[in-house]
A protein has these predicted regions:
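Mid/C-terminal beta-alpha module of Rossmann-like enzyme folds, strongest
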Residues: 66, 73-121, 126
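Non-catalytic, hydrophobic alpha-helical segments
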Residues: 63, 67, 85, 96, ...
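Active-site helix adjacent to the Tyr-X3-Lys
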Residues: 2-6
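NAD(P)-dependent short-chain dehydrogenase/reductase
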Residues: 7-55, 61-62, 68
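A secondary-structure boundary/capping signal
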Residues: 21-22, 50, 87, 114, ...
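C-terminal amphipathic/interface module of NAD(P)-dependent oxidoreductases
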Residues: 108, 123-154
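An accessory alpha-helical subdomain
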Residues: 23, 49, 54-58, 83-96
Length: 154
């Protein structure tokens, strides 16, 4: 990732550029954690979800709006560089799944487990939380999730 970010800066040759880092994206299109958990809540008697990996779930519509407001139609030109854009707050995959279950009014138990108890083909970082210090903060991840599930019942 870092090499790609450096390549962008080099390729721009001094012209303004922006690299946006984000995490744990979900939205109305494609496969994502919210859609998967919603489906599994209806299919499985219980869900086991890792509780020791931390991040900031980010609603794609919030991200798109922030990109438009800050980079495409900004009030003032920003300095070139790397910007973090995620919904505010930090959670675990387990807490994220629990919140989805609560908002969906599901009675399927969601059980916390350790990463080591959930085999994945690729190792995941324990902390992928990004701190947004250069731009206005986006709404809390729970508010974004609630809005998403009201607007796009998956």
């Amino acid at each position: 990732k870092l090499a790609g970010e450096k390549a962008v800066a080099y390729a721009m040759g001094g012209a303004p550029y922006y690299v946006v880092r984000t995490s744990w994206l979900y939205g109305p299109n494609g496969k994502n954690f919210v859609a998967t958990i919603t489906r599994l809540l209806n299919e499985k008697p219980e869900l086991k979800v890792v509780n020791d990996q931390f991040g900031s779930p980010t609603y794609t519509m919030d991200l798109a709006l922030a990109v438009l407001q800050n980079f495409i139609f900004p009030r003032e030109l920003l300095a070139s560089g790397i910007y973090h854009l995620t919904n505010s707050g930090t959670t675990t995959w387990y807490e994220f799944a629990k919140e989805i279950a609560t908002l969906k009014k599901s009675e399927t138990p969601v059980i916390p487990i350790a990463t080591e108890d959930y085999p994945l083909p690729a190792k995941r970082p324990q902390h992928s939380t990004l701190i947004n210090t250069k731009l206005p903060k986006l709404r809390d991840w729970k508010a974004g999730l609630e809005h998403f599930l009201e607007k796009y019942p998956v």
